[in-house]
Amino acid sequence: ASGDLLDTIYLNQRRQSWYEEYLIKLGDPEPLPFVGSAQGLDATTAATLITEALDYQVTNRTKLRPISKVRSHLMTKFEELGGLVIFNSMVGNNTKRMLDLEEFRGFTLQSPIAPLIFINANDTVNGQIFSFLHECAHVWHGGNSGVSAGGDPLDNRDTQIERWCDQVAAEVAVPTTDLRDNFNPH
């Protein structure tokens, strides 16, 4: 892993720790019910849980134009659930240290009270949305924190879980039933 990726992870671990300490000072925080709630579920069922939690049903999406509103909507809904979301294209605010999209697209830092999703904003908006949905799948699955897509997986990449997260993200983005109902080959 590059120094830029490691520094980005460390910075966000500090942010997450600060937020966890803040929540503890406010009172005894309850574990967020969605964290780990999809473990053992098939991708379609998990996608339904995420879609409902993020209020991202197909019927609601027509209001979300242009595409940047989709990203904003998903981020806001995840934060309303109690999670943290960071979209950034550089290490901290250092414009001389741009993040390499080929190295990673996003990562999740798991926490029962403050899960954090980081998305590499050097990707297209559509790519960022898919990466966000993929990282949401990690949060709903629970388990270890980790880096998604790119080169060195920091020795924490389970390809079966990564495939499952991709399937969940794809199902949230384009539900199979909606695709079947609206696809007309003639």
Where are these regions (language model features)?
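Short juxta-domain linker segments that transition from a proline/glycine-rich
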Residues: 1-186
